[in-house]
Amino acid sequence: MRIRPHSETWLKRPPRPRVPARLRPWLTDPGSLTARIRSRCSLFSVNVLAQRLAVPHPDEAALLGLRRGELAWLREVLLVADGVPVVFARSILPRHDVRGAWILFQGLGSRPLGAALFADPRIGRKPLACACLDRRDARYHRASAAAAPRRLPLALWARRSLFGLRGRTLLVSEVFLPTILELPT
């Protein structure tokens, strides 16, 4: 089986018949996902899985204006509500921007990136896009490995958007684990 990113599957809106009704608000809310999860649990935490230079997937590189194979800063985390992983998040930043516009990206540790993004009024967000990721997608496998030992369904819904600050962009992708639906609405 060939594992690849699904550049062609990112949609402006989640298709109504395919997306579970309880998941739709999570996919479409333009506000802070961190704040939304925090408001629905007693204990919120961020489990940092990776923060390093890496080659983004081709569709991610294209969104950020990077050449194929060019290194970028990668941060992968699990958002955890009351001890249960609910979201696998992946952030990509052109490596030359980590010292400039996006200095906040350095030294985040286990602090949520979302809290920093939505606290700064200078940071703008482009519209959300969503996709149904299946086992052919590398992001599905990263989310699955991070959520182990839980078994995941054959497909996971995700959303992503670009954040802008002083002409520089940051890509944030969020893959929703089935446990997100266990949080109160």
Swiss-Prot record:
Organism from which the protein derives: Aromatoleum aromaticum (strain DSM 19018 / LMG 30748 / EbN1) (Azoarcus sp. (strain EbN1))
Kindly list the places in or outside the cell where this protein is found, as annotated in its UniProt entry: Cytoplasm
Q: Which GO terms describe its cellular component?
A: cytosol
Catalytic activity, reaction form: chorismate = 4-hydroxybenzoate + pyruvate
Which gene name belongs to this protein?
ubiC
Kindly state which keywords UniProt assigns to this record, in alphabetical order: Cytoplasm, Lyase, Pyruvate, Ubiquinone biosynthesis
Q: Which residues bind substrate?
A: R75, L113, E174
- The protein in question is named Probable chorismate pyruvate-lyase
Q: Does the keyword Cytoplasm apply?
A: yes
Role, per record: Removes the pyruvyl group from chorismate, with concomitant aromatization of the ring, to provide 4-hydroxybenzoate (4HB) for the ubiquinone pathway.
Q: So what family is this one in? A: Belongs to the UbiC family.
EC numbers on record: 4.1.3.40
